[in-house]
């Protein structure tokens, strides 16, 4: 987010992060305090707190960090809040992809796909692919393109995923997402709008893929004209 918005603006991260957390909760992506959201504006990185009811986060409960991952402003509340455990992984996206936002979901569809696939989730010839961009070219995928989302193994603590996620991002420079087996997914993009659109499209495709699997349909059909 290149434009610096006043704190009263509905799209300022102080207001936007709680709104998106509520949306994610309603979708089943951030239940049980799970999931996370971070948005960059100017030189600051805004991060939701950890271990809280995501649908009840307030604008004064957001952490503000600098590019060195140092806290420059703590939440403006008396609550003893803890910064998101996802923070080092968000910064993978900021440092390696120059992202404007990074989203973390605990979607059931993502977890199921991580159990159905070995090292990658691949799907092609579905219209909703067009809502996802190639991370290198920044161009939207086409109907005949193949979406590839790599999968890394889960760890006991979120921070311990940092190195394996970074290694995976280096190996898959075109991908805007990484699946964590039995856990969830991280998605990033240049703006929060694009990141939101991408995670919605990928989640849709994963839900569709699960149903296709049940019907014996191929995720990468070879005979589609």
Swiss-Prot record:
Zn(2+) binds at residues 104, 106, 183. Gene3D superfamilies: Class II aldolase/adducin N-terminal domain (3.40.225.10). One of its GO terms (biological process) is L-methionine salvage from methylthioadenosine. Catalyzes the dehydration of methylthioribulose-1-phosphate (MTRu-1-P) into 2,3-diketo-5-methylthiopentyl-1-phosphate (DK-MTP-1-P). Its main location: cytoplasm. Pathway: Amino-acid biosynthesis; L-methionine biosynthesis via salvage pathway; L-methionine from S-methyl-5-thio-alpha-D-ribose 1-phosphate: step 2/6. Belongs to the aldolase class II family. MtnB subfamily. Binds 1 zinc ion per subunit. Substrate binds at residue 86. Its EC number is 4.2.1.109. One of its GO terms (cellular component) is cytoplasm. This is Probable methylthioribulose-1-phosphate dehydratase. The lineage of its organism: Eukaryota, Discoba, Euglenozoa, Kinetoplastea, Metakinetoplastina. It is an enzyme of class 4 (lyase). Keywords: Amino-acid biosynthesis, Cytoplasm, Lyase, Metal-binding, Methionine biosynthesis, Zinc. Disulfide bonds: none annotated. It is found in: Cytoplasm. One of its GO terms (molecular function) is zinc ion binding. It catalyses: 5-(methylsulfanyl)-D-ribulose 1-phosphate = 5-methylsulfanyl-2,3-dioxopentyl phosphate + H2O. Its cofactor is Zn(2+). The active site is at residue 127.
